[in-house]
A protein has these predicted regions:
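Cleavable N-terminal export/targeting peptides
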Residues: 1-29, 195
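A short beta-strand motif that forms part of the nucleic acid-binding face
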Residues: 120, 144, 168
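Predominantly the C-terminal beta-signal and adjacent terminal strand-loop region
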Residues: 80-84, 138, 148, 154-195
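Gram-negative (and chloroplast) outer-membrane scaffold detector with strong preference
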Residues: 23-25, 29-30, 34-43, 59-133, ...
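Low-complexity, intrinsically disordered/propeptide-like segments
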Residues: 9, 13, 17-19, 47, ...
Length: 195
């Protein structure tokens, strides 16, 4: 008799949990594309004899696959602008490359969602400097840089959405050649999902 009661209880629990979990396993497989623009800020150590401008205009283009209403896979290209320093030494540091990220979404209502993202990115850090007109520490390196981000999306329609996001790319560059820097990106984007 206890076995019957236990089986009945388990069946009831499964039937109650099914509506809550069905959405997560309900695949939509909807492709999407998007473009964003914003401002990147470089976490640089500015030499005492130089003046640094550590922010610049940045942009991204991306595409991916919405697996279900909660998870999407995204691949893109990011140009994070460049930081400039003038004085002694003077020069630039710029970052660009390929982004590979997993995007999570949680709908507050049909029009508004919160977004979280993380990924493994293949970014190139290029540093070019001069001292008294002579090239100095001109180095470049492409390496893996991890990233995290938070944001929100407002849906104008079933297919078109607007996003506002903050992202941080950690340890861009190589510690032994270019040195490593963190880059923050604040951006707004338009995304189109093929539904």
């Amino acid at each position: 008799m206890k076995t019957i009661y236990l089986a009945a209880a388990m069946a009831s629990a499964l039937s109650l949990s099914t509506p809550a979990t069905a959405g997560f396993f309900d695949l939509t497989l909807a492709p999407f594309i998007g473009a964003s623009a914003g401002q990147a800020s470089y976490d640089l150590s500015c030499p005492a004899t130089s003046t640094c401008d550590d922010s610049d205009t940045a942009w991204k283009i991306y595409g991916g696959l919405e697996v279900n209403e909660y998870i999407a896979m995204e691949v893109g290209y990011a140009d994070l602008g460049e930081a400039k320093f003038s004085g002694t030494p003077s020069g630039t540091a710029e970052v660009n490359g390929m982004t590979v990220q997993l995007v999570g979404s949680f709908a507050i209502n049909p029009s508004f969602s919160l977004i979280g993202r993380g990924g493994m990115n293949f970014l190139n850090l290029e540093k070019n400097g001069t001292i008294a007109g002579t090239p100095h520490n001109n180095e470049g390196d492409t390496d893996v840089a991890w990233s995290l981000g938070l944001g929100a999306q407002y849906n104008l329609s079933k297919s078109v959405g607007l996003r506002a996001e903050w992202e941080r790319y950690f340890k861009v560059g190589d510690e032994d050649t270019t040195g490593e820097i963190d880059v923050d990106l604040i951006s707004a984007s338009v995304v189109y999902t093929f539904r």
